Amino acid sequence: YRPELNTLMVHAGVPPQWDPLLTIKLAREVEQALRGRHCAEYIRDLYGEQPDRWSPGLTGQDRLRFITNCLTRMRYGTVDGTLGLQETGPPGSQPGYLRPWFDLQGRQTAMVRVVFGHWASLGLLQRDNLLGIDTGCVWGRKLTAVRLDGPAKTYSVQCHKVPDT
């Protein structure tokens, strides 16, 4: 989060309940787990889809897993804040009860520019205070960068598709 640029950058998404400062605080909790002497335990139990709803009272591995899922996997959620991690397609392909994370009501990051990726099927998304820059390099499409020290200016280059192994 760069307050002077009014910009928050995340890999995937931010739950509607988190503001930029809380997002950074929670990301640091995961960073500490990765740097800590129990990092192997954290990584061993990292992958999972529960808990799927934020609560400030979450603790331990459940808390770290939820934070990690939001910041690295989140694409969709429900109006009550439940994650929809199974869906990976572009908006419109998901079940009707799910919304893109950035369209959920009450989003506490709505007043800052959020730059995110991890959604190749979405493609380039430019809205007021929202910039999705995953343009599908992994699929042989484009790699996109953005200049943030002013109005968002994007730059894209063609990628080569990596053969399946």
State where each predicted segment sits.
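Feature recognizes metal-dependent phosphohydrolase scaffolds
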Residues: Y1-T165
